[in-house]
Amino acid sequence: MAEKRNIFLIGPMGAGKSTIGRHLADELHLEFYDSDQEIEKRTGADIAWIFDLEGEEGFRAREETVINDLTDKQGIVLATGGGSVVSKAVRNRLSARGIVVYLQTTIDKQVARTQRDKRRPLLQKDDPETVLRRLAEERNPMYEDAADYIVDTDEQSARAVANQIIEKINQ
């Protein structure tokens, strides 16, 4: 039997990785995983609490372990955390073990999509837009470098983006 392909979704918070990933997995009959949800499941704690207790460095170490474990599976769609690409080891692992799709979005869309979400520790500041701009400057080159495909998520439904990804990977 042919080996099933893995699809890994990367991009900033608010790009739609989890929502699009569920649609993609459903359409392709693959298992869906969200690295943040998997971390919460394994630790029994939410991301914000892990950040408070262990700092970003402790969280990133957990994230790297979870992504390593999940990318060893076959036939999955994985929505990664927005900061996972900061780790060169994670970027290399994603590239080596599947198809990497960068879900691109604007800062304005990120602000609109994340403004009521209290589960995002990096945005619990007075000026989340400034934080998002700084993160974009830092991470966008890493997303681009790791990506096999880049898909814009701003003006399309999650289902339309999932279908666009399927078209791209089947070309």
Swiss-Prot record:
One record GO biological process: chorismate biosynthetic process
The keyword Endoplasmic reticulum is assigned to this record: no
Main location: cytoplasm
Gene3D superfamilies on file: P-loop containing nucleotide triphosphate hydrolases
Pathway noted in the entry: Metabolic intermediate biosynthesis; chorismate biosynthesis; chorismate from D-erythrose 4-phosphate and phosphoenolpyruvate: step 5/7
A single MF term (Gene Ontology): magnesium ion binding
Pfam families, alphabetized: SKI
Entry EC no(s): 2.7.1.71
Residues reported to bind substrate: 36, 60, 82, 139
Alphabetically ordered keywords of this record: Amino-acid biosynthesis, Aromatic amino acid biosynthesis, ATP-binding, Cytoplasm, Kinase, Magnesium, Metal-binding, Nucleotide-binding, Transferase
Needed cofactors: Mg(2+)
Keyword Secreted: no
Class of the enzyme per the UniProt entry, highest EC level: transferase
Binding site for ATP: 14-19, 120, 156
Cellular component terms (Gene Ontology): cytosol
Co-factor: note: Binds 1 Mg(2+) ion per subunit.
Subcellular location: Cytoplasm
Quaternary structure note: Monomer.
Role summary: Catalyzes the specific phosphorylation of the 3-hydroxyl group of shikimic acid using ATP as a cosubstrate.
UniProt family annotation: Belongs to the shikimate kinase family.
Protein name in the entry: Shikimate kinase
Organism: Pseudoalteromonas atlantica (strain T6c / ATCC BAA-1087)
The encoding gene: aroK
